[in-house]
């Protein structure tokens, strides 16, 4: 008996609008590249002359240093704020909420200016009992905050508020059953957090956290109000002297692109490494489970069948 087998021809789906959109996008990209590359008013020769200038590189170094220190301090302080927000103590939770609400509401430039004028607002700081006039010591604030320290403190205060919410969201994203399972192991609270909860929370924290680091790197441009020679203020000083505004702004834009590209590459590598580690852990866990099952099967004695007899 012969079977009738029909050959099914698979026809790929066609998306004409997608092709039209790609052509339009390529056309617009070509127009933009031509207008930017061949317009003499962009002054690319000036751009090339200043891009690796030692003064510019020093400004880039200051920007990277502010980003590194601000990130480290905001992660530490933001982590403490996140734990306070998750605390069962209403006082700690309320204080952390108030801090986060305040510094997420204030623009960074306002915080920097207030900190820079701190010695004007408070010429001396005293330690004592409030509302009694009893003081144990005091010191002048005239030289407490310089340009660099003001920039670091301002960036940390503002950035830690955003970092705290990111870390808190990561902990809340962990399934509640994981907390119960960790508590059942009888480990101390800090070990449960570091060894069990935090690795799972990092999957949620890392993408948003790196976005905040990139925002912080660009936000360092706000410290120009302190006359600190980071990248943007250095470029301002140069183009105020040479009147070559556009090419020097392009130098700054290019360096910010380089910084954010490097940070994005680091983010990609960290996320891939974390995913690879999770896959290895899952494979090892499955192997351990299969070995445990095989051992239980081999060690369990075979039961002889029970035969019923009629007497």
Feature map (PLM): residue ranges:
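Transmembrane alpha-helices and adjacent helix-loop boundaries
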Residues: 1-311
């Amino acid at each position: 008996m012969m079977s009738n087998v029909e050959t099914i021809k698979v026809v790929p789906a066609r998306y004409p609008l997608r092709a039209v959109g790609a052509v339009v996008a390529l056309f617009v990209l070509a127009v933009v590249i031509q207008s930017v590359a061949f317009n003499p008013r962009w002054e690319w020769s000036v751009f090339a002359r200043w891009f690796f200038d030692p003064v510019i590189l020093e400004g880039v170094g200051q920007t990277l240093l502010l980003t590194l220190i601000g990130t480290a301090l905001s992660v530490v302080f933001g982590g403490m704020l996140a734990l306070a927000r998750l605390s069962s103590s209403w006082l700690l939770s309320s204080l952390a909420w108030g801090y986060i609400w305040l510094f997420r509401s204030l623009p960074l430039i306002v915080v920097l200016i207030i900190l820079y004028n701190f010695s004007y607002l408070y010429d001396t700081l005293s330690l004592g009992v409030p509302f009694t006039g009893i003081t144990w010591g005091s010191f002048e604030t005239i030289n407490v905050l310089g340009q660099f320290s003001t920039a670091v403190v301002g960036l940390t205060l503002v950035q830690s508020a955003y970092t705290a919410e990111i870390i808190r969201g990561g902990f809340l994203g962990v399934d509640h059953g994981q907390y119960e399972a960790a508590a059942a192991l009888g480990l101390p609270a800090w070990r449960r957090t570091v060894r069990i909860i935090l690795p799972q929370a990092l999957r949620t924290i890392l993408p948003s956290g790196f976005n905040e680091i990139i925002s912080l790197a660009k936000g360092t441009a706000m410290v120009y109000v302190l006359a600190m020679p980071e990248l943007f203020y250095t470029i301002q000083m140069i183009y105020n002297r040479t009147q070559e505004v556009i090419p020097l702004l392009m130098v700054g834009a290019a360096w910010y692109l380089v910084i954010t590209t490097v940070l994005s590459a680091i983010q990609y590598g960290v996320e891939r490494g974390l995913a690879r580690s999770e896959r290895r852990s899952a494979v090892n866990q499955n192997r351990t489970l299969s070995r445990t099952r095989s051992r239980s099967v081999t060690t369990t004695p075979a039961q002889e069948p029970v035969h019923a007899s009629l007497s």
